[in-house]
């Protein structure tokens, strides 16, 4: 494994460890660097900020997980994703608390939107029927459907991570 990936993984694990004791909002790049025993220069060589590090963690771990899944078996894939989030719930609960510019919620919402577009859309004829009924184009109906499902999953995930409200 290239040294660059080892450094990224070390920074990632450090952030995951720190979020167990501090809120994401209060964790600074200095905290990550001190705990990981690397310089700020090293951190900024790999990531533009802590938000980019959090997104990298999500992206690399989700990609690795999805590569192991049979994507044709939707329920098994969903089950694997649920297990991943359960195993990493403290980390993601910490990330989901932060709202605002560069928030993980936005990145996660975009991931969900893409996932719905690829794996959970109804058949084309159903989208066309909904579009006809609503007086919109099929593309508009598809985007509305995808965004609605993605937003519902995001809200359910947020509530679950906050303690099951």
Regions found by a protein language model. Name each.
Residues 11, 30-35, 43, 85:
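Append "Primarily bacterial transcriptional regulators
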Residues 67-94:
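Hydrophobic alpha-helical connector segments
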């Amino acid at each position: 494994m290239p040294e660059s990936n080892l450094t990224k993984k070390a920074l990632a694990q450090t952030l995951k460890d720190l979020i167990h004791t501090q809120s994401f909002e209060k964790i600074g790049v200095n905290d990550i660097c001190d705990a990981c025993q690397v310089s700020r220069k090293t951190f900024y060589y790999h990531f533009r900020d802590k938000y980019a590090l959090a997104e990298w963690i999500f992206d690399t771990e989700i990609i690795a997980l999805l590569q192991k899944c049979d994507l044709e078996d939707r329920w098994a894939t969903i089950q694997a994703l649920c297990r991943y989030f359960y195993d990493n719930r403290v980390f993601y609960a910490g990330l989901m608390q932060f709202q605002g510019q560069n928030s993980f919620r936005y990145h996660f919402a975009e991931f969900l939107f893409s996932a719905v577009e690829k794996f959970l859309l109804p058949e084309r004829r159903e989208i066309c029927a909904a579009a006809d009924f609503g007086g919109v184009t099929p593309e508009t109906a598809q985007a509305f459907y995808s965004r609605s499902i993605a937003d519902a999953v995001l809200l359910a995930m947020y509530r679950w991570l906050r303690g099951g409200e």
